[in-house]
């Protein structure tokens, strides 16, 4: 009985110390209380049971992290809530574990973590291990999963799921607040593959106008198209009011006044048009110097004058207008007769017709052959085919009213 109670004065901790002598981390038996060391062994065993791979990697590469584990007290029954750790340290641990799984050498790992710019050896996870130092993000947003190289779109477009229980860092990184903060600052964990380059709205490149106060409409349309294409947020946020203001200001500046010609300039231009409907460039330059006008103004005046003459011809070609309008302008036949010789009266407009058509030798008709009325019939067709100016209509109407005078021309 004495032998069985002889060990009763020893404490339970001393007995456990005696039994745990051959523990791989046990201490030699002492007279002091070693109950704290036993609790340490239990906590260490529990931690190794939950994180076998990370404990090994931390013992190899991060010795300081072992001291952090000793201060933590992990509850025995909570498998779904791992101990919270610092976000930055957690990202480094994940990167270290992935590279260790790929069988990376410790020297290469330290070189990659300390000097991310210099690439010593190609690895599929090189971008994810060095993006933190290169981007200099305020909050570490590097998330490495078990897959060696996840796609960029998966990391950028993933919808935040707060109910996921992978780890605490996932919630910190992919929370809506952090995403909005990253969108505001413009710092992304991985840049999206198709990021539109937002350019400031550029001013439209417009060519200088030919004359002051004039701007081509093509340049304005190019300016509008250029601003629409280079708008940062598309056509939805495009400032159309600004374009309308610029167009209104351009129209005010480019409003031209109608060119007014003096009576002397108009008279000289009418004289030139009477002889030549189409003028050469040399003649146009001479007229411009004589009338103190620009070459462009003279060209436009002749174009407008030809259009006006064409409209007048279309109105005067009707037989009613021809018979009523130009017969009143003809002089009487008795006034043109010669009183001294008593020769048959010859109408003056017939000779005036040959004088005015002298400038057009191709249109004039030769009367040297005496063929009578048969020779004068093609002349009427010639006048109907080539209509140059109103005098021809005048003579044509005179032929219709006085056919007996054609005999005197032969």
From Swiss-Prot:
PANTHER family: HOMEOBOX PROTEIN HOX (PTHR45659), HOMEOTIC PROTEIN ANTENNAPEDIA-RELATED (PTHR45659:SF22). The keyword Transferase does not apply. The keyword Nucleus applies. Residues 254-313 bind DNA. One of its GO terms (biological process) is regulation of DNA-templated transcription. GO terms for molecular function: DNA-binding transcription activator activity, RNA polymerase II-specific; DNA-binding transcription factor activity, RNA polymerase II-specific; RNA polymerase II cis-regulatory region sequence-specific DNA binding. InterPro entries: Antp_homeobox, FTZ_N, HD, HD_metazoa, Homeobox_CS, Homeodomain-like_sf. It is found in: Nucleus. Changing residue 208 to L: In allele Ual2; half-life is increased. Coiled coil: none annotated. It holds the Pfam family Homeodomain. Belongs to the Antp homeobox family. May play a role in determining neuronal identity, may be directly involved in specifying identity of individual neurons. Required during embryogenesis for the process of body segmentation. Homeotic protein, required in alternating segment primordia, it specifies the correct number of segments. Residues 71-93, 138-157, 175-221 are annotated as: Disordered. Gene3D superfamilies: Homeodomain-like (1.10.10.60). GO terms for cellular component: nucleus. Signal peptide: none annotated. Residues 76-85, 190-199 have a biased composition (Pro residues). This is Segmentation protein fushi tarazu. SUPFAM superfamilies: Homeodomain-like (SSF46689). It comes from Drosophila melanogaster (Fruit fly).
């Amino acid at each position: 009985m004495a032998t069985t109670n002889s060990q009763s004065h020893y404490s339970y901790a001393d007995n456990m110390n005696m039994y745990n002598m051959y523990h791989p981390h046990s201490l030699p038996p002492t007279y002091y209380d070693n109950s704290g060391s036993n609790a340490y062994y239990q906590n260490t065993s529990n931690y190794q049971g939950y994180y076998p791979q990370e404990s090994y990697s931390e013992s190899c590469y991060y010795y300081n992290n072992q001291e952090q584990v000793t201060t933590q007290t992990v509850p025995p029954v909570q498998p779904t809530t791992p101990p919270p750790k610092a976000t930055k340290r957690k990202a480094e641990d994940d990167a270290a574990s992935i590279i260790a799984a790929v069988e990376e050498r410790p020297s290469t790992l330290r070189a990659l973590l300390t000097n991310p710019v210099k690439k010593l050896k190609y690895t599929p996870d090189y971008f994810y291990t060095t993006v933190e130092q290169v981007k200099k993000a305020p909050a570490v947003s590097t998330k490495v999963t078990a897959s060696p190289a996840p796609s960029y779109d998966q990391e950028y477009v993933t919808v935040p799921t707060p109910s996921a229980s992978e780890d605490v860092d996932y919630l910190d990184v992919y929370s809506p607040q952090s995403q909005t903060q990253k969108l505001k600052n413009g710092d992304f964990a991985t840049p999206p593959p198709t990021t539109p380059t937002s350019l400031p709205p550029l001013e439209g490149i417009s060519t200088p106008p030919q004359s002051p106060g004039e701007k081509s409409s093509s340049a304005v349309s190019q300016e509008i198209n250029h601003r629409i294409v280079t708008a940062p947020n598309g056509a939805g946020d495009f400032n159309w009011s600004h374009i309308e203001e610029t167009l209104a200001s351009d129209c005010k500046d480019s409003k031209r006044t109608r060119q007014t010609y003096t009576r002397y300039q108009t008279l000289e231009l009418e004289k030139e048009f009477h002889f030549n409907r189409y003028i050469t460039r040399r003649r146009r330059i001479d007229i411009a110097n004589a009338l103190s006008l620009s070459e462009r103004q003279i060209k436009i005046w002749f174009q407008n004058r030809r259009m006006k003459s064409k409209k007048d011809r279309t109105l005067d070609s009707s037989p009613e207008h021809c018979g009523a309008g130009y017969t009143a302008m003809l002089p009487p036949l008795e006034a043109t007769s010669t009183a001294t010789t008593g020769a048959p009266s010859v109408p003056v407009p017939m000779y005036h017709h040959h004088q005015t058509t002298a400038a057009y030798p191709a249109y004039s008709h030769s009367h040297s052959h005496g063929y009578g009325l048969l020779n004068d019939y093609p002349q009427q067709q010639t006048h109907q085919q080539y209509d140059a100016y109103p005098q021809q209509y005048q003579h044509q109407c005179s032929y219709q009213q006085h056919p007996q005078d054609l005999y005197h021309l032969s």
